[in-house]
UniProtKB/Swiss-Prot annotation:
Gene Ontology annotations of biological process type: translation
Annotated organism of origin: Chromobacterium violaceum (strain ATCC 12472 / DSM 30191 / JCM 1249 / CCUG 213 / NBRC 12614 / NCIMB 9131 / NCTC 9757 / MK)
Gene: rpsL
Disordered, as annotated region: 104-123
Listed PROSITE patterns: RIBOSOMAL_S12
Family from the record: Belongs to the universal ribosomal protein uS12 family.
Protein name according to UniProt: Small ribosomal subunit protein uS12
Pfam (any one): Ribosom_S12_S23
InterPro entries attached to this UniProt entry: NA-bd_OB-fold, Ribosomal_uS12, Ribosomal_uS12_bac
Length: 123
C-alpha cells in the first residue's frame, strides 16, 4: 500500500485497454485489396481447409482475413470490406471479410442467417 505522500507524488496509473482489432483504427469496417487468397489448416483438435485472404487495407496495414460461408469468388486484386472478429482456431486471423459487399459475392442458396452472408431473400 502506498502512503498518501507517495500517491501525491506519483498517482495511480490507469490501465489502458488494448484494441483487439488495431488495423481498423476505431472504424467499424475498412476497405482493402486482396494480395493473396489461400487455404490454411486450423489448430489441434480441428481439421479443415479454412479459406483466408491477405488484405492490404487503405490505411497501409496488411492483415489476414477469414472468408466465411460455403464457396467464394475472391482472387488477387479483389476489393473487399473487412470487419473485426477473430477465428478461434486460426492463429493470427483477427478479421472477417464482409460477404455481399464490394467484390465479395454473397453465399449462394443460403436460407438461414442470410444477413450475415449477403444472401438475398429466396423467392
Amino acid at each position: 500500500m502506498p502512503t498518501i505522500n507517495q500517491l501525491v507524488r506519483k498517482g495511480r496509473v490507469a490501465i489502458t485497454a488494448k484494441s483487439k482489432v488495431p488495423a481498423l483504427e476505431a472504424c467499424p469496417q475498412k476497405r482493402g485489396v486482396c494480395t493473396r487468397v489461400y487455404t490454411t489448416t486450423p489448430k489441434k483438435p480441428n481439421s479443415a481447409l479454412r479459406k483466408v485472404c491477405k488484405v492490404r487495407l487503405t490505411n497501409g496495414f496488411e492483415v489476414i482475413s477469414y472468408i466465411g460461408g460455403e464457396g467464394h469468388n475472391l482472387q488477387e486484386h479483389s476489393v473487399v470490406l473487412i470487419r473485426g472478429g477473430r477465428v478461434k482456431d486460426l492463429p493470427g486471423v483477427r478479421y472477417h471479410t464482409v460477404r455481399g459487399s464490394l467484390d465479395t459475392a454473397g453465399v449462394k442458396d443460403r436460407k438461414q442467417a442470410r444477413s450475415k452472408y449477403g444472401a438475398k431473400r429466396p423467392k
